[in-house]
Amino acid sequence: MTNTISILGSTGSIGRQTLDVAEQLGLRVAALTANSNVERMEAQCRKFQPRLAVMTEESAAAELKIRLQDTPV
């Protein structure tokens, strides 16, 4: 059984460190949230393949949706 986590503020310093630890421990990432850093969120989504990605800034959410069209996120 794989443990699963969700990370709020994944593009910030603590969120990035948490993702590093999750990767080292082999944890599955179910969800990522961020405010507006679309480039970093896209990279995280492509790497960790969460089921859900949420951006609080509406224009960032729209941009992320376009960028991730080729993924199941």
Residues of each region from the PLM?
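N-terminal Rossmann-like dinucleotide-binding module
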Residues: 1-53
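Conserved N-terminal Rossmann-fold NAD(P) cofactor-binding segment
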Residues: 39-73
